[in-house]
Amino acid sequence: MTKTKIMGILNVTPDSFSDGGKFNNVESAVTRVKAMMDEGADIIDVGGVSTRPGHEMITVEEELNRVLPVVEAIVGFDVKISVDTFRSEVAEACLKLGVDIINDQWAGLYDHRMFQVVAKYDAEIVLMHNGNGNRDEPVVEEMLTSLLAQAHQAKIAGIPSNKIWLDPGIGFAKTRNEEAEVMARLDELVATEYPVLLATSRKRFTKEMMGYDTTPVERDEVTAATTAYGIMKGVRAVRVHNVELNAKLAKGIDFLKENENARHNFS
C-alpha cells in the first residue's frame, strides 16, 4: 500500500504565526520531535525563519544559530530531517550534518546556488510556488509553468526527478479564490509525475473554509479535511502541525484508496 508521508512542522522561531516561541530551544525542540515521531511523522521539517505576513527578515547568521543546534541534536534520530530554508548557506551547513531534504519556499529563485548545493549532497528538495502575486496568466497555469521550469533547472544541476518535490504554495502570493482554484486542480500538479507536498496546516485558507474567526489550533480538523482531499487528488505528502490527527486520517484514506484501486483492477 502506498503510504502518504507525514511531515511534522518544527518551528524554532520566536514569531511563527502558530507556535512561535514554543520550540526555540534545543530541549523543547527535541521533546517535540520525539512526540511527533511517536505520533507518526515520517519527516521533521525544521524552520528558523517565520513566513507569517509581516515577518521580519533575519540574517543568515541568526538563521544558522536557530537551526543548527536543533539539527545537530536530532539528525541521528530514526526519521527523515528536512530544513525549511531558501538560503544555500543554511542548506549546506545542514546538509553537512546529514539532513535529507531542503524545503525551499522560493523554489531556487531566491538563491541560485541552492540546486548545486542540494545536488552536491545527493539530497531531496521541495520546490514551493511563490511570487509577488502579480501574474499574466491564470494562477494554476502560472504555477505549473514556474514549478516545472525550476524542476528542470534542478535536474540540470544534478538532482534526479524522484528527489524533486512540488508544493503548490497555499498561503503564498495567492488570493482566496486563487487558493481555492489551486486546491480544486491539485490533480494537474500531480499529473506532472513529480511527488507533490501539500502544506495547508492552520493557514488562512483553512480559517476561511470554516467561515469564522479561529485560532490556528482550532483549524486542525479543517486542515485534516484538506489532507484527505489532497490524498484523494494524489498528493504524496502533507506538512502539518498536528501530526497525530493527520497521520491517522492519512492511514485511513490510504487504505480506502488502495481498496478502491484493488476493486478496479479486479473488475
UniProtKB/Swiss-Prot annotation:
InterPro entries: DHP_synth-like (IPR045031), DHP_synth_dom (IPR006390), Dihydropteroate_synth-like_sf (IPR011005), Pterin-binding_dom (IPR000489). One of its GO terms (molecular function) is metal ion binding. Its cofactor is Mg(2+). It catalyses: (7,8-dihydropterin-6-yl)methyl diphosphate + 4-aminobenzoate = 7,8-dihydropteroate + diphosphate. Residues 1-251 form the Pterin-binding domain. Mg(2+) binds at N11. Pfam families: Pterin_bind. GO terms for cellular component: cytosol. Its EC number is 2.5.1.15. One of its GO terms (biological process) is folic acid biosynthetic process. Magnesium is required for activity, even if it seems to interact primarily with the substrate. Pathway: Cofactor biosynthesis; tetrahydrofolate biosynthesis; 7,8-dihydrofolate from 2-amino-4-hydroxy-6-hydroxymethyl-7,8-dihydropteridine diphosphate and 4-aminobenzoate: step 1/2. (7,8-dihydropterin-6-yl)methyl diphosphate binds at R52, D84, N103, D167, K203, R239, V240, H241. Keywords: Antibiotic resistance, Folate biosynthesis, Magnesium, Metal-binding, Transferase. Specific mutations in this gene are a major cause of sulfonamide resistance in MRSA clinical isolates. Catalyzes the condensation of para-aminobenzoate (pABA) with 6-hydroxymethyl-7,8-dihydropterin diphosphate (DHPt-PP) to form 7,8-dihydropteroate, the immediate precursor of folate derivatives. NCBIfam families: DHPS (TIGR01496). Belongs to the DHPS family. Homodimer. This is Dihydropteroate synthase.
